[in-house]
């Protein structure tokens, strides 16, 4: 499938079952939706939210954040959150979560320790996910797990804005506003629309938002650590899977790169380049963040390079036929989600 972009909002498609003037033919749309729905089912079933494993789950490798270990002798072992969680899917836990986050912040001796200790809050509210029996209850549990990291993100931002000098604050504010504007579009790219996913949509949406909000919290914590003169190490991230965008310094996505496992467990990439087109294909992991990409129709080959928190790039090595891409062309995706 090859999609040609005339501009950022007007899309025409060529090579799809002779359906001129349509973005996607009906048959292709049904197949695409079915494939995506099955993939998302595998994604959710792989998460601890269904299995009772909590958020310390056996993640499929789509997640950018690798599992972290807590230092054996860390003082965070002394932190105990107040009150065991009472399971009530009609309860508003907003204030409870805020109090728990505040407790973590006040009892942590460094930002590094604070971010590690946040897992204690997640563990506390994972009992909601473990007790969930219906789709509605699963949706509620996912919302509160996302709220934990959203609360921590807001807490970090409050401290950043009061500590940074004027120029730093202005730069960070612009970046944060762009991230907020981008996250809805990035979520749509990764999980699809509400119409595609039906009653599962809130679960998929909040689970994905939890993941990228946690990642963003680490970014803000790193910036705050710089201001405070603290050492801060970013966690390991996948050298194969992730979502990367080029937003041209705005709140809109111009180009994007998504690398992931599909519902069959095969490695795939979706690459969208501003004013040129979108291609889908498979990749082979060469190690060290280098992925050899081949489009579905074989017309485009290239090398994806993933640089962790610093983004990714795609260099085209071969292009054939009517491909809008040219050999030697390279696209940067500097923002990692």
Question: What are the functions of these language-model segments?
Answer:
Residues 170, 181, 188-189, 271-313:
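Contiguous, well-ordered beta-strand patches that form the walls/edges
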Residues 55-126, 235-245:
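N-terminal, intrinsically disordered, polar/charged segments of Gram-positive cell-envelope systems
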Residues 277-280, 285-287, 318-337:
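Edge beta-strand at a domain terminus
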Residues 49-52:
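C-terminal motif of bacterial Sec signal peptides marking the signal peptidase cleavage site
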Residues 231-254, 334-336:
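Tryptophan-anchored aromatic micro-motifs
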């Amino acid at each position: 499938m090859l999609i040609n972009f005339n501009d950022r909002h007007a899309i025409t498609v060529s090579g799809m079952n002779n359906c001129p003037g349509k973005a996607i033919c009906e048959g292709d749309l049904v197949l695409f939706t079915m494939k995506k729905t099955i993939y998302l089912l595998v994604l959710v079933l792989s998460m601890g939210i269904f299995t009772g494993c909590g958020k310390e789950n056996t993640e499929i490798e789509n997640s950018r954040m690798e599992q972290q270990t807590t230092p054996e002798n860390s003082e965070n072992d002394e932190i105990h959150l107040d009150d065991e969680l009472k399971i009530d899917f009609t309860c508003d836990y907003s204030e409870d979560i805020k109090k728990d986050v505040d407790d973590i912040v006040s009892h942590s001796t460094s930002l590094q320790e604070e971010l590690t200790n946040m897992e204690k809050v997640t563990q506390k509210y994972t009992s909601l996910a473990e007790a969930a029996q219906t789709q509605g209850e699963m949706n509620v549990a996912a919302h509160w797990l996302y709220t934990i990291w959203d609360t921590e993100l807001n807490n970090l931002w409050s401290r950043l804005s009061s500590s940074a000098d004027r120029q730093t604050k202005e730069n960070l504010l612009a970046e944060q506003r762009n991230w907020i504007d981008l996250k809805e579009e990035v979520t749509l790219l990764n999980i699809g629309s509400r119409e595609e996913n039906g009653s599962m949509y809130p679960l998929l949406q909040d689970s994905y938002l939890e993941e990228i909000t946690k990642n963003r919290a680490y970014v803000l914590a790193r910036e705050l650590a710089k201001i405070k003169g603290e050492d801060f190490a970013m966690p390991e991230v996948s050298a194969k899977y992730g979502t990367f965008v080029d937003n041209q310094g705005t709140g809109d996505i111009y180009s994007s790169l998504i690398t992931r496992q599909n519902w069959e467990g095969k490695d795939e990439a979706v690459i969208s380049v501003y004013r040129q087109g979108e291609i889908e294909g498979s990749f082979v992991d060469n190690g060290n963040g280098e992925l050899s990409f081949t489009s579905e129709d074989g017309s485009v080959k290239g090398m994806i390079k993933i640089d962790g928190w610093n983004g990714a790039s795609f260099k085209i090595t071969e292009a054939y036929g009517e491909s809008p891409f040219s050999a030697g062309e390279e696209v940067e995706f500097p923002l990692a989600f």
